[in-house]
């Protein structure tokens, strides 16, 4: 579960390395899960890339440490909290996605992120 002040790693090559969640988008929501959109501040970034430190960006959560339960009864859990930066059209800002992503992203219409990911769990 991601909430305000949570630090996340960035799972794409947009230039950002660490994010801090500012807000979970939605009507008065406290927690974000896989597939939810958050507003975050860039805390660490590579030089000469598309984003800079202290930029405010939108991102979609692709991995969480909290257990994710599926309707089939399966549950999965990742080793880190990670997000992918997106633009206003909900397309990824980077051209590559690193690490596995959850299948729930396809149901939330983030098909571009799913197609860029090396593994879908």
UniProtKB/Swiss-Prot annotation:
Keywords: Ribonucleoprotein, Ribosomal protein, RNA-binding, rRNA-binding. PANTHER family: 50S/60S RIBOSOMAL PROTEIN L14/L23 (PTHR11761), LARGE RIBOSOMAL SUBUNIT PROTEIN UL14M (PTHR11761:SF3). This is Large ribosomal subunit protein uL14. Binds to 23S rRNA. Forms part of two intersubunit bridges in the 70S ribosome. Part of the 50S ribosomal subunit. Forms a cluster with proteins L3 and L19. In the 70S ribosome, L14 and L19 interact and together make contacts with the 16S rRNA in bridges B5 and B8. GO terms for cellular component: cytosolic large ribosomal subunit. Gene3D superfamilies: Ribosomal protein L14. One of its GO terms (biological process) is translation. It holds the Pfam family Ribosomal_L14. The lineage of its organism: Bacteria, Bacillati, Cyanobacteriota, Cyanophyceae, Synechococcales. NCBIfam families: rplN_bact (TIGR01067). It comes from Prochlorococcus marinus (strain MIT 9211). Belongs to the universal ribosomal protein uL14 family.
């Amino acid at each position: 579960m991601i909430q305000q002040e949570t630090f996340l790693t960035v799972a794409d090559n947009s230039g950002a390395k660490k994010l801090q969640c500012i807000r979970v988008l939605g009507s008065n929501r406290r927690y974000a899960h896989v597939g939810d959109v958050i507003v975050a501040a860039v805390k660490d970034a590579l030089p000469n890339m598309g984003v800079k430190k202290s930029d405010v960006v939108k991102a979609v959560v692709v991995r969480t440490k909290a257990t994710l339960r599926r309707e089939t009864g399966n549950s999965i859990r990742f080793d880190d909290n990670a997000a992918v930066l997106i633009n206003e059209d909900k397309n990824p800002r980077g051209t590559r996605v690193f690490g596995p992503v959850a299948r729930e992203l396809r149901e939330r219409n983030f098909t571009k992120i799913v197609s860029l990911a090396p593994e879908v769990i």
